[in-house]
Structure formats: structure tokens, C-alpha cells
């Protein structure tokens, strides 16, 4: 028997943004840390908006 769990992309984007920023900080020099952190944050915000408002996430009920 296979149990399929509902997947919510919006719920996953913020933790992935923090993980990506942490990876960028650990891998890059101090001069580029801020740039990559901002880029990753903007991408994660765009993904969050996409999953919540465009895809109309019904799993987590985050949409107002």
C-alpha cells in the first residue's frame, strides 16, 4: 500500500531559501555573500507568491 502525502510547494520555499542562503555563506567569499543571499531570497519570495496565489495552494490554506 502506498500512502501519498499532499505536497505544498509554498510551505517548502522558505526553508529552502534559508538552506540556500546558508550554503552560499559557507561556500563564497565575504564580498559575494550579501549578493547571493539577496538573490536567493528574491527567488524564494517569487516561488512563494507563485505557489500561494497562482497555483492556489489548498493544502496549507495560507491563501487569504
UniProtKB/Swiss-Prot annotation:
Signal peptide (UniProt feature, chain positions): 1-26
Stated family: Belongs to the IIV-6 010R family.
Subcellular location(s) per record: Host membrane
Annotated TM spans: 33-53
Topological category with respect to the lipid bilayer: Single-pass membrane protein
Entry keywords, A to Z: Host membrane, Membrane, Signal, Transmembrane, Transmembrane helix
Lineage of the organism: Viruses, Varidnaviria, Bamfordvirae, Nucleocytoviricota, Megaviricetes
Main location: host cell
A cellular component annotation (GO) from this entry: membrane
Protein name: Uncharacterized protein 043R
Organism the protein comes from: Invertebrate iridescent virus 3 (IIV-3)
